Each structure stands twice: as structure tokens, then as C-alpha cells.
A protein has these predicted regions:
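Conserved Rossmann-like nucleotide-cofactor binding loop
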Residues: 11, 36, 139
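Glycine-rich FAD pyrophosphate-binding loop
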Residues: 20-41
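Conserved N-terminal glycine-rich FAD pyrophosphate-binding loop of Rossmann-like flavoproteins
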Residues: 35-53
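C-terminal helical "tail/cap" subdomain of flavin- and related membrane-associated enzymes
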Residues: 21, 296-413
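Conserved mid-domain beta->alpha element of the FAD-binding
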Residues: 5-21, 133-134, 247-328, 332
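Conserved FAD-binding catalytic core of PHBH/FMO-like flavoproteins
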Residues: 105, 128-249, 253
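Conserved N-terminal helical subregion
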Residues: 48-165, 369, 373-386, 412
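Extreme N-terminal starter segment of soluble prokaryotic enzymes
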Residues: 1-3
Length: 413
């Protein structure tokens, strides 16, 4: 099969790797419009479930990724004016640029033709391909050409956020919340290589405007943020990968859904097909899962239309719950003042429960009361709820047992 992948992110590269491993006779070209080594963001975060998927589908690149990743241990939630809370958990961070380098090197070693500075803006440029894989991100040009068939919907979130980095080490995944004269502002931080940590800053638009962050020059905005988070940075500075017109590249998260993921011989994967809010930390894992699922569908079916239809249905079903929880998580942070007025342990419980549909629909105190009642009911082995499992999803699978008993491997970011 002749395959053209447009976009050399994790989804496009890993699909090429898996397909080439399954059948070396496939002719696969990956087109990337940017020069080699170009990337956005700093580090990405993942857990053992992704490593297991990588080891199953390509042990060689999985081992390299595991060797390059930086483990972090535990999570910390630090609300200014209250004692920090610690949560037992663990995961990994890795430099996004290094992750892409590993995947490019592996793809090349398998015989994939990876072409940088190769811009594909029209489907006619890859018309000779049997299969065209659009892995060109949330602003996919290829998707735009078939918008009437894919029927994408993009919804911009309310909060402002920016991906920064710092030389301050964060050995635990850390949330820090700081009040300002314009409202609350917070960060999510984790180490991704020795001496460098990702530092994502988020706030409501009123806080962003009130602090002047949208109008300041990049250097002044960084100094303002360094001052706000001085206790956490401990003398270390903040770094931005780029600025637009001497301004920091603040964003509003765009949630993307498509009615269908394939049209004729064009199929969407990764951020071209879907996005999930960064506060659930699933973007890289979902991109890899798309790649593996597409390769599997192509191997299982003897016709391209049936394979693409099976892939689309399988992944859209798998994504439905994740996307719903991501929306709830984003909305929780957009309504932070509703929750942060509670003491630190209660706030942490609400943070862990942010994917609960019930929490969104009722006052926090009512939710906490019902959750306590539910916990007591299910504590007894004789309880009917305990025997059948009960409506756990309504109380948040991570929150129903409280902070210390939250399920392992399901962090609060």
C-alpha cells in the first residue's frame, strides 16, 4: 500500500512505525512542513499505560523513550495560605522534541521516508497515495478541504493559558494556586528532563486582563509571572519558546470534534481528529492509541473502506467518555472560585472529582455530602451498592474514596 502521512507529530510518526513493522512492503512517506527539530511546547507527561502500549507495538522505540523519560513521584497541590497537600502517584515526563526525534529515527530505521519542509496543503499533492493520513493537527488543512464531510466543530475555552518552562526542578507533579488583585492564577509543573520543567500557567480572562498579561511585552510578562510565583520558582526564571510580536503566545484551548473521521481515502488521527483539554494529560496517549488502532484496522480488514469505517467507529466510541471528562475538567478550572474557597483537603477532593457530572450540576457542599453518604453505604460488604458496584461514575472514580484512597495512576492534573 502507498501511504502518505501529513504531519510528523506522535500520531503520524507512530502510525508509520507500526504499519512498517507489520508489513515492510508498505511504501510510507511522512510529510512535515516544518524543519527537523521544530516543535511547540516543552515536555509531555505520560504514565505506565502508554509505556505498555509502546512496548507491545514497538519494543525498540519504547525502550529508548523509557530510558529518556524523567520519572516524577507524587503530586502536590499548593494553595497559597494553606499547607500543601501530597498525593501518592507517579508518572513520566519527556522532552517533546526528544520524543519526536526518537520516533523519527525509528521510522527512518524501518525504511519510512520522512520529509521535512514538505508542505502538503492540497490533497492533489498526494493523489497517488492509496491512503492519506491527516495527522496535521487541530488546524488541519487537509480536514478543511473535506470539511463538508468531516463536519468539524471547534469550541474555544474561556480560560487563558500558556506553556512555559523553568530550570526549577519539580520532582512531583505540582499545582500551585496564587491569589492576585485581579483574581486567582495557577500553574501545573513537572520535570521532563534534567534541569528543565514544564510550567503551564492558566487563569480566567478577567485575571489575564486585570494583570495586563495580554498587552505586556514578553519580557515584562515573564517577570510578572516570576514575581507571582516567586515562592515556587525559588529564584529560577521562566522561559517561553517564542513570542508573537513581542507578546507571549497565550492561548484559549480549542476543543475539536468531528462527525466522522474518514472521507474516501482520507482519515484523521491525533489532534486533526480530536482534542482533549490539557488538564487530563491524555493528548500524547490518545495520539498513539489512534495510530495503533488505525494500523490494526488496516490489518484486520481486506478493504480500505471497511478498515477506515471500523477504525472511525472504534475510536469515536473510545473517545466519547474521555472527551466528556475533558470538558468537565476544563469547566471545573473555568469555575475555580466556586471550589477554591474551601479548605485545602476539601479543595483537593473537589479537584480529584472534577470529571464528575454530578459535581457540575449541584452545589459543592451537596456533592460532598452525597459522596460521604455513598462512601458509607459502599463500605459495608452487605450493601447492595457494594455488591453491584453502585453509581461510582456519578461521584468521580477518583474522588469517591477521598484523597489518600484515590485510585493509583489517576492524577489530578
Amino acid at each position: 500500500m502507498r501511504i502518505s502521512c501529513v504531519g510528523a507529530g506522535p500520531a503520524g510518526l507512530y502510525f508509520a512505525i507500526v504499519m512498517k513493522r507489520r508489513n515492510p512492503n508498505h511504501e510510507i512517506v511522512v510529510h512535515e512542513r516544518n524543519p527537523a527539530g521544530t516543535t511547540h511546547g516543552w515536555g509531555v507527561v505520560f504514565w505506565d499505560d502508554l509505556l505498555a502500549t509502546l512496548r507491545t507495538n514497538d519494543p525498540d522505540s519504547a525502550q529508548t523513550i523509557a530510558d529518556q523519560a524523567v520519572p516524577w513521584s507524587g503530586q502536590v497541590v499548593d494553595v497559597e495560605g494553606q499547607p500543601p497537600l501530597h498525593y501518592v502517584d507517579g508518572g513520566y515526563g519527556i522532552c517533546r522534541r526528544r520524543l519526536l526525534q526518537i520516533l523519527v529515527e525509528r521510522a527512518l530505521a524501518l525504511g519510512v521516508d520522512v520529509r521535512f519542509e514538505s508542505e502538503i496543503s492540497e490533497l492533489s499533492q498526494v493523489a497517488d497515495a492509496d491512503l492519506i493520513v491527516a495527522a496535521d493537527g487541530v488546524a488541519s488543512r487537509l480536514r478543511r478541504h473535506r470539511a463538508d464531510q468531516f463536519r468539524p466543530q471547534i469550541e474555544a475555552g474561556r480560560n487563558k493559558y500558556i506553556w512555559l518552562a523553568t530550570t526549577q526542578p519539580f520532582p512531583s507533579f505540582t499545582f500551585g494556586f496564587v491569589p492576585t488583585s485581579a483574581g486567582w492564577i495557577w500553574f501545573h509543573a513537572y520535570s521532563f528532563k534534567e534541569g528543565v520543567s514544564t510550567f503551564i500557567v492558566e487563569c480566567a480572562p478577567e485575571t489575564w486582563d486585570g494583570l495586563g498579561l495580554g498587552t505586556m511585552r514578553a519580557d515584562a510578562a515573564l517577570k510578572t509571572l516570576e514575581s507571582i510565583f516567586a515562592k515556587h520558582l525559588d529564584g529560577h526564571g521562566l522561559m517561553s519558546r517564542d513570542g508573537h510580536g513581542n507578546r507571549l503566545p497565550w492561548l484559549s484551548f480549542r476543543t475539536l470534534v468531528n462527525r466522522t473521521w474518514h472521507a474516501d481515502n482520507v482519515v484523521l488521527i491525533g489532534d486533526a481528529a480530536h482534542t482533549t483539554h490539557f488538564t487530563i494529560g491524555s493528548g500524547t496517549r490518545l495520539a498513539i492509541d489512534d495510530a495503533v488502532a488505525l494500523a490494526s484496522a488496516l490489518s484486520e480488514h481486506d478493504s480500505l473502506p471497511r478498515a477506515l469505517d471500523a477504525f472511525s467507529r472504534r475510536r469515536q466510541r473510545a473517545l466519547a467518555r474521555v472527551q466528556r471528562e475533558a470538558r468537565l475538567s476544563a469547566e471545573w478550572f473555568e469555575n475555580l472560585p466556586r471550589y477554591i474557597r474551601y479548605n485545602a483537603p476539601t479543595f483537593f477532593t473537589l479537584l480529584l472529582a472534577r470529571r464528575s457530572r454530578l459535581l457540575k450540576r449541584m452545589p459543592a457542599r451537596t456533592y460532598l455530602y452525597l459522596r460521604r453518604k455513598y462512601t458509607k453505604l459502599t463500605a459495608s460488604a452487605a450493601s447492595p451498592l457494594a455488591r453491584i458496584g453502585g453509581p461510582a461514575h456519578r461521584f468521580g472514580s477518583k474522588a469517591r474514596r477521598g484523597i489518600s484512597g484515590a485510585e493509583p495512576g489517576t492524577p489530578c492534573h
